[in-house]
């Protein structure tokens, strides 16, 4: 395949989306199911790995081996409170590997564990394939988005996931900034406007304030919560119904993973219904121990269950306004992004906060982020299209960055909401006489003491010549690149000795070797997926060929055109093959192909004879079926064996 353009990928907690900029406009690309967003789900079964819709459709049957929300684990520690509380809601197993979380699943009959970055990389691979199928070209360059409030390790984890999936990540950009690009281009903003992006998705929440003027997008401030979204609203509803079930039936379903998963699917559906109706009913047959669960929930009750979470979305709005030094009256446009902004109560709270100002719903909340990422990908690849060539993006770093100085004090070198890329240098000195070295510990966060902030990494600068305290001059430089990822260096001015680290967050990061290993594993898994797909395709081909052959020779219209002996010969062979198929569903591709050849050996001469005697196609024969045509081989890329029928609660 020839080389395709760079794409923009919105790697979401619950859904992902991919877009490409070509012929002067953005195309959001639909997947093989015709959906423009793809669930960020990866499932492992006895025979195969499923990604996207296929994985989500079978989650009720296979809850413990279906991984979702990998984003919520990316770049976090196992003991992180967030990880611990999420684990209570997930049916799959999360294990502690050297204080890093890994998900544990059964795949092809063995136990396997994956880093969250690997799971995210599988979702990215799927998005890459969706783009390649549409473009008919290979895709290797991408811009990937992260929540604006993501810290350094979460950004780095996303970049690693891209590398593992075989993508060259041009840049990591913030979701609300990407959405602002979509808005700015859509609205053709000319004169300066202050725009507030309110982005509430499935797993994270961001508020960013930008000034847009003639193609320059300048982020003034950003705030948010990387752990608040639609999933949390679902959790509240699930807990509410578990309690109701206990009350009505005196049984606790919370330990039954399949029951909880079916309930969650129903809750997610009910939540969506409540955005347009004031009541939703839930009907789940035989939810637990044969008990049917029929109930309903009103919009008012749903709002009450989530009252604190909904109201809490206004805190980051206030913080972003304060940091941007703006009054709410100075905001020209309030733009809604992310599926959860469809919730009427959230819209009402936001509108009331801005004194009744109309909210802007002109951009598609599910696709805006991928749209903006695709535009940025085109710019970085040098697209000369007039609508994008003058576009300039000035983003900011969301958290203050600094080092620990005497007494555990956080000394900030780069304040939050500083435009990136940026570089700051500050000179420090020693704390005691003849101190031979200094330990440089790098932190991010807003608290005065480092113990309350997040340690990103540390390194030592040694070999400082003996001198009284306060004499040596150690120059520390923080350098943040366009991805929002930081390099730190320290130099002793007297000797010129230097030491530096890229903050690869030793605690939460994959080493280069890890990543290389995972890249190879990803290729191996992909090859296995392809083998499985070919196998299913060969099996389906054989099956449809056998059945078509049968129905062809049994056709009334062929009476007298084919001898009973020939007819019986074909029927016997077809029945033999169909019987073999029933017993050998898991055979290898070669075996299916061998059976097909054997069957064709019997059928082809008879069918050819039939053609010649009939002078062409006999009437009523399914056109072009018999002969060497391997039945209705599943289209390559079909993934699963025909449509999976899902249980709809």
UniProtKB/Swiss-Prot annotation:
CDD domains, alphabetized: ASKHA_NBD_HSP70_HSPA1
A GO BP annotation: chaperone cofactor-dependent protein refolding
Gly residues: bias regions: 616-641
Region (Nucleotide-binding domain (NBD)): 2-386
GO MF: ATP binding; ATP hydrolysis activity; ATP-dependent protein folding chaperone; heat shock protein binding; protein folding chaperone; protein-macromolecule adaptor activity
Keywords: ATP-binding, Autophagy, Cell membrane, Cytoplasm, Lysosome, Membrane, Nucleotide-binding, Nucleus, Stress response
Localization per Swiss-Prot or TrEMBL: Cytoplasm; Nucleus, Nucleolus; Cell membrane; Lysosome membrane
Transmembrane segments: none
Alphabetized SUPFAM superfamilies for the sequence: Actin-like ATPase domain, Heat shock protein 70kD (HSP70), C-terminal subdomain, Heat shock protein 70kD (HSP70), peptide-binding domain
Binding site for ADP: 14-15, 202, 268, 271, 275, 339
Pfam families: HSP70
InterPro entries in the cross-refs: ATPase_NBD, Heat_shock_70_CS, HSP70_C_sf, HSP70_peptide-bd_sf, Hsp_70_fam
Membrane disposition: Peripheral membrane protein
A GO CC annotation given for this chain: cytosol
Region span, Disordered: 614-649
Region (Substrate-binding domain (SBD)): 394-509
Domain of life: Eukaryota
The record's note on its domains: The N-terminal nucleotide binding domain (NBD) (also known as the ATPase domain) is responsible for binding and hydrolyzing ATP. The C-terminal substrate-binding domain (SBD) (also known as peptide-binding domain) binds to the client/substrate proteins. The two domains are allosterically coupled so that, when ATP is bound to the NBD, the SBD binds relatively weakly to clients. When ADP is bound in the NBD, a conformational change enhances the affinity of the SBD for client proteins.
Family note: Belongs to the heat shock protein 70 family.
Its biological purpose: Molecular chaperone implicated in a wide variety of cellular processes, including protection of the proteome from stress, folding and transport of newly synthesized polypeptides, chaperone-mediated autophagy, activation of proteolysis of misfolded proteins and the formation and dissociation of protein complexes. Plays a pivotal role in the protein quality control system, ensuring the correct folding of proteins, the re-folding of misfolded proteins and controlling the targeting of proteins for subsequent degradation.
Protein name: Heat shock cognate 71 kDa protein
Species: Danio rerio (Zebrafish)
Organism lineage: Eukaryota, Metazoa, Chordata, Craniata, Vertebrata
Annotated gene: hspa8
């Amino acid at each position: 395949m020839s080389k395709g353009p760079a794409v923009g990928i919105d790697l979401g907690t619950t859904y992902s989306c991919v877009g490409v900029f070509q012929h002067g406009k953005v195309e959001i690309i639909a997947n093989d199911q015709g959906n423009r967003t793809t669930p960020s789900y990866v499932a492992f079964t006895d025979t195969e790995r499923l990604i996207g819709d296929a994985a989500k459709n079978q989650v009720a049957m296979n809850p413990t081996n279906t991984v979702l929300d990998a984003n919520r684990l990316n770049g976090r520690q196992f003991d992180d409170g967030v990880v611990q509380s999420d684990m209570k809601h997930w049916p799959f197993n999360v294990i502690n590997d050297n204080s890093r979380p890994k998900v544990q699943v059964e795949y092809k009959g063995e136990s396997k564990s994956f880093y969250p970055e690997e799971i995210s990389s599988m979702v990215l691979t799927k998005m890459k394939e969706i783009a390649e199928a549409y473009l008919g070209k290979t895709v290797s360059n991408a811009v990937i988005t992260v929540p604006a409030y993501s810290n350094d390790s979460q950004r780095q984890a996303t970049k690693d996931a891209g590398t593992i999936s075989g993508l060259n990540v041009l840049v990591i950009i913030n979701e609300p900034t990407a959405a602002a690009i979509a808005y700015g281009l859509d609205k053709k903003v000319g004169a300066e406007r202050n725009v507030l992006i309110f982005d509430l998705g499935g797993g994270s929440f961001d508020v960013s304030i930008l000034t847009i003027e003639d193609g320059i997008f300048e982020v003034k401030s950003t705030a948010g919560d990387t752990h608040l979204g639609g999933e949390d609203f679902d959790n509240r509803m699930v807990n509410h119904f578990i309690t109701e079930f206990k009350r009505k039936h005196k049984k606790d379903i919370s330990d039954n993973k399949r029951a909880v998963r079916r309930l969650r699917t129903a809750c997610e559906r009910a939540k969506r219904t409540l955005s347009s109706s004031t009541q939703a009913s839930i009907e789940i047959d035989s939810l637990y121990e044969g008990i049917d669960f029929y109930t309903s929930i009103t919009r008012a009750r749903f709002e009450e269950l989530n009252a604190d979470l909904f109201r809490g979305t206004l805190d980051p709005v206030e913080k972003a306004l304060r940091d941007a030094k703006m009054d709410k009256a100075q905001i020209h446009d309030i733009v809604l992004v992310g599926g959860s902004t469809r919730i009427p109560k959230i819209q009402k709270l936001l509108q009331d906060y801005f004194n009744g100002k109309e909210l802007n719903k002109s951009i598609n909340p599910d696709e805006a982020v991928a749209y903006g990422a695709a535009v940025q990908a085109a710019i970085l690849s040098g697209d000369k299209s007039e609508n994008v060539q003058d576009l300039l993006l000035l983003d900011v770093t969301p958290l203050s960055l600094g080092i620990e100085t005497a007494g555990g004090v956080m000394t900030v070198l780069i304040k939050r909401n500083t435009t990136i890329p940026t570089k700051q240098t500050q000179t420090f000195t020693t704390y005691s006489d003849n101190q031979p070295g200094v330990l440089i510990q790098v932190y991010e966060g807003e608290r005065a003491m480092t113990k309350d902030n997040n340690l990103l990494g540390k390194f030592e600068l040694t070999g400082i010549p003996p001198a009284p305290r306060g004499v040596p001059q150690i120059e520390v430089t923080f350098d943040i690149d366009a991805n929002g990822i930081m390099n730190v260096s320290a130099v002793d001015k007297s000797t010129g000795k230097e030491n530096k680290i890229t903050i690869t967050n030793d605690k939460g990061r994959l080493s280069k070797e890890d990543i290389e290993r995972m890249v190879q594993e990803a290729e191996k898994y992909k090859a296995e997926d392809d083998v499985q797909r070919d196998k299913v395709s060969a099996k389906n081909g054989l099956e449809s060929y056998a059945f078509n052959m049968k129905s062809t020779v049994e056709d009334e219209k062929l009476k007298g055109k084919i001898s009973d002996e020939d007819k019986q010969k074909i029927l016997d062979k077809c029945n033999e093959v169909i019987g073999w198929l029933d017993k050998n569903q898991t055979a290898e591709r070669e075996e299916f192909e061998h059976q097909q050849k054997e069957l064709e050996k019997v059928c082809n001469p008879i069918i050819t004879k039939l053609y010649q005697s009939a002078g062409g196609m006999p009437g009523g024969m399914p056109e072009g079926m018999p002969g060497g045509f391997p039945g209705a081989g599943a289209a390559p890329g079909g993934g699963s064996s025909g449509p999976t029928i899902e249980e709809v609660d």
